[in-house]
């Protein structure tokens, strides 16, 4: 079983959904966790309360990952509260499916700023504190492989995350830092529900073509993240790990 005892992790966008599940499972495996949120303070505090009630250690920190100062603040929280940093999970993400004719500069920049620039800025801020054995996990998406219609901007961001993961694995590998992407299929989260994906024809089609015959749950992604964060995955870097129930 993967153990993270003595490790310190930062999880961005961790007030709900996949991020909350990852933060909770990292803590359950023994890590001290910084739970980042951009606006949902109540959600982040709920995650921390659950972690501490189970005997774990966690704190919240507010920050917009697409802002350099905020990215630095997020990382500083780990050092201030726990004295070091071993694991970075770049989970913050926004999405809006939009057909080409409706794409605007605002739609483009909002998604690329959070999903791509945010991944770079948080990792950049973390780098001075990461040493041999550290793990960076970028949360991508199956969309970069299946390229659904009306998702050119969102899919573009996740394709960029895939590419950045490969580049950083080469760049940071000599320092002993592993970098991987964890790419979920459709997962039942608050965001997926509010976007109308859960229960939609698109979701039903996706599940019917998934070899394991079901959609994903946040815990499915969180368990994979714990493994990638652990020393059990010490020889894995530069990989795109598809957590999709076999869908591709």
Identify the residue ranges that each predicted region occupies.
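Conserved glycine-rich cofactor-binding loop
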Residues: 8, 15-16
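Substrate-binding pocket helix/loop in short-chain dehydrogenase/reductase
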Residues: 99-100, 104-112, 206
